[in-house]
Amino acid sequence: MTDKKAIITYDDQKERDARNELYELLKECPIPEDQVLSNLGLFLNSKNLSRILFMNYIYQKIVDVQGVVFEFGTRWGQNVALFAALRGIYEPFNRHRKIVAFDTFEGFPSIHEKDGDSSMMVEGMLSLTENYDQYLSSVVSTIEKDNPLSHIQKFELRKGDGIVEIDSYLEQNPETIISLAYFDFDLYAPTKKCLEAIKPRLTKGSVVCFDELNDPDSPGETLALMEVFGLENVTLKRFPYVSRISYFIVE
């Protein structure tokens, strides 16, 4: 039976063994509990650190751009937590920099023929543990408590199919301008729908990021971008230390 919580990786056995060993060391960590969080860098490998560096890099590009942050396909929510922390660093009093995360929290809702035939293209793939959205909400709420304006909730988790939730959110929040949109749905249909929905709400300087462009395992993401924006109309860039993430700045 397919493990629908699993992800596709491209590492070899030696790398997997090293990662598993590091995880065991984390579980056995002898650091006092009140000092563990301030020493999490002890367990960061280069791959995971590079993604954090990218999030910092891309967040800096929107500090002077008005608008909220959208993440499409948040899964375990690491990016949401990072964006909340980065907001606390760069603009702690910006109550308008709301972070909105969209996810079914139950895996892929459906597969389109344009999503290809990769082994990951299975309904329900990339599912999460039960009630994970509630846990994630608690984590991000706690992060916000450690920053200014903690009495104002500046994040929202939208649980459900992005095809439906994007219209619902924008109808409920007609004032929405988007400074950063991060796409990690992996799928054609919700990516295309959400690109179409947010396009009129992007401003010059807004940043649009993708996790799976030019990826044979997730061809639908590229096709969605081609159909909504056209590759000839955007300047796709990549961060030199992260292989898979692409982005463009609205010009």
List PLM regions with ranges.
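Conserved alpha-helix/loop element of class I SAM-dependent methyltransferases that forms part
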Residues: 53-64
